[in-house]
Amino acid sequence: MNILTVNLILSTVIFAIVAKLYLIPALPRLELRTVVLPILLLHAMRHLGLMFLAPGAVFPGIPAQFAYPAAFGDLITAVLALIAIVAVVRNSNLARPLVGLFNVVGALDLIDAIALATIYDAAPHMGPAYWIPAFWVPALLVTHYVVFVLLGKRWTGPMCASEQLIVHACNDAYEAISSP
């Protein structure tokens, strides 16, 4: 029995149950940005996938055929999430296609990483980074599903107070890093 596979499946089921019980039923009442911005912010943290390339975060012998695609796939997805955040915050016409691009690339990256970890038996070499596929990947898979659901919904309308707070915080952060 592959313990990582069991962890991955059970964690995914648990996150899916949480989404089914609490998030999916609330979607019709929520503005899209209220849901998509926190998901994009979560995925912006996928730069942590670079840990698969960090000595000490993984054990020696981690298969390069798994580590490099997983690490750089996560990094690319994190960058796409950041780009999509800017588009969503600015209510750009590119928001929907950029969120879609982020979501397809990110979901395919996770599927690829799961397949490569299985094919190349990466689990015994993951060391402290084991928590990424045991916890993060299931949560991220479920949020990708939620974003696919959101992509089929309306993308206009007034912002609620919580959205306005997120948008203002993102705008302030953007201005802080872009001004000399």
Regions found by a protein language model. Give the residues of each.
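Hydrophobic transmembrane alpha-helical segments in integral membrane proteins
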Residues: 1-15
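Small-residue-rich transmembrane alpha-helices that serve as helix-helix interface/gating elements
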Residues: 9-12, 128-144
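Short, highly charged, low-complexity non-transmembrane loops/tails of multi-pass membrane proteins
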Residues: 157-177
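Non-cytosolic membrane-interface motifs at loop->transmembrane helix junctions
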Residues: 62-72, 98, 123-134
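Membrane-interface helix-boundary motifs at transmembrane edges
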Residues: 25-36, 90-95
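Hydrophobic alpha-helical membrane segments
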Residues: 73, 77, 81, 98-118, ...
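Alpha-helical transmembrane segments in multipass membrane proteins, preferentially the mid-helix core
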Residues: 76-91, 146-150
